[in-house]
Amino acid sequence: MSSVEMKEQENILPHGGELIDRELTGDRKESYLHKSKSLLALKLDAWSLSDLELIANGGFSPLTGFMGEEDYQSVIENVCLKDGTVWSIPITLAVNKEQADSYDIGTSIALFGEDDILYGVLELEEKYTYEKEKEASLVYGTTDAAHPGVKKLYEKGDVYLAGPIFMLNRPSHDNFEKFYYDPKETRKMFAELGWKTIVGFQTRNPVHRAHEYIQKSALESVDGLLLNPLVGETKSDDISAEIRMESYQVILKNYYPENRARLVIYPAAMRYAGPKEAILHAIVRKNYGCTHFIVGRDHAGVGDYYGTYEAQDLISQYEEKLGIQIFKFEHAFFCTKCENMGTEKTCPHGKEFHVHLSGTKVREKLRNGEQLPKEFSRPEVASVLMKGLSKNNTN
């Protein structure tokens, strides 16, 4: 074993104990590419394609494919796979009944993207129906079709296809390729940097001052920060990944020690499942090699569907079984009296001095053409966001 591999062993084990790798190369890839020409095809939407990628690259370890019915029922009802491994979100592949009837159990299905590129193969082991309202209630905590994750669920086909997958071609990530690392690569990077303890931070928003505060608070206790923004499918009113990625680069360059933070994309779709998605986010960062994970206010939430600290409360129940330490932070604010960031734990001043920050407020101000005040955002970040949105609005 090389010195780098030995260092990797000192870091956290993947979820389930083994880092899954279902991405084919060399002769096996060529064999499947040849075989795929005679297979029935299925076109994946962006959401399912990102799931395929994260199963294949190990981000969703220990999953090796789309979930069968036993795992599915166990996940939605008991927050674990059928073998007892903690898992909170069903990773499934839905089709309509007519499509499902065209596929025979035991056959392989060629998986194409909406761009007609062949990305993978599914070895079909199961087909099963499911109750959409039951899944919505148990996973999202609501059956309200106005919830973006529930809306997506209700629009899906009525049958789930299940079985192991192989990825033949990795999806392109356009301008973000230099920030793409799979879990094997992040683990190697952490080892080369000499990081033994790493905190992961999930975001779909630009980094505002509250984010910076909790990231740096966590950095006081660990060797490094993995800033791991989601660049997959999000709501239409979320700030685009292109603008956000530029803002992340700017803030890391100007306000973080170069040897203490790394920017890596998380190529997943956003489910907006709040507490249940917080658990999934922790599992994925564990697979990427993080020893710690930050859960702040209303993690992975949307609207008023979840309580401010509901995600923290739920993930605390599973922290020991998850095998990753959770940093839980209160709602941070800028205190105009302190002239600094703080929380109720560190600031003695009244609410009239507190400027509360959130991704929603940042988005609202930007869309209204308002300059972000220094209490909200670093000026370099504000400039990137204003220019980016202005450019988007004129296109």
From Swiss-Prot:
Protein name, as recorded: Sulfate adenylyltransferase
Pathway where this protein functions: Sulfur metabolism; hydrogen sulfide biosynthesis; sulfite from sulfate: step 1/3
CDD domains: ATPS
Enzyme Commission number(s): 2.7.7.4
Keyword Acetylation: no
Family: Belongs to the sulfate adenylyltransferase family.
Keyword presence, Nucleotide-binding: yes
InterPro entries from the UniProt entry: ATP-Sase_PUA-like_dom, PUA-like_sf, Rossmann-like_a/b/a_fold, SO4_adenylyltransferase_pro, Sulfurylase_cat_dom, Sulphate_adenylyltransferase
Record PANTHER family: PTHR43509, SULFATE ADENYLYLTRANSFERASE
Source lineage: Bacteria, Bacillati, Bacillota, Bacilli, Bacillales
Biological process terms in GO annotation: hydrogen sulfide biosynthetic process; sulfate assimilation
NCBIfam families per UniProt: PRK04149.1, sopT
Molecular function via GO: ATP binding; sulfate adenylyltransferase (ATP) activity
Xref: Gene3D superfamilies: HUPs, Sulfate adenylyltransferase
Keyword terms of this UniProt record: ATP-binding, Nucleotide-binding, Nucleotidyltransferase, Transferase
Catalytic reactions of this protein: sulfate + ATP + H(+) = adenosine 5'-phosphosulfate + diphosphate
